Amino acid sequence: MKSLILSAAALALTAVLPAQASEDLAKKHLCTTCHVVKGAKTIGPAYADVAKKYAGQKDAEAKLADKVKKGGQGVWGQVPMPPNAAVPDADLKALVKWILSVK
């Protein structure tokens, strides 16, 4: 019984940690200066809106990763998104997967 409870707790933690880890990565790389997870657009779009826009696109991860690395302008308004080339590839992959999963 004790091992069953511990297994359930470990499973629950693994379900929560990736999302939190990615939100923490967004904070670490200063993404949250311009973006929120859900809600009204601040400077940049909310991640939930980004996920909706890219939903169903086969190349969504590659497109979004490219936007993060190189920056962009004109997709969400006239305020440019600065390039974030210093974000390590592993962090970038985790961030993009997380952003695209936000509901």
Please place each PLM-identified region on the residue numbering.
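Post-cleavage N-terminal segment of exported redox proteins
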Residues: M1-Q20, W98-K103
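Sequence/structural segment immediately N-terminal to covalent heme-attachment motifs in c-type
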Residues: Q20-V37
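Axial heme c-ligation environment in periplasmic c-type cytochrome domains
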Residues: T33, T42-Y54, D66-V96
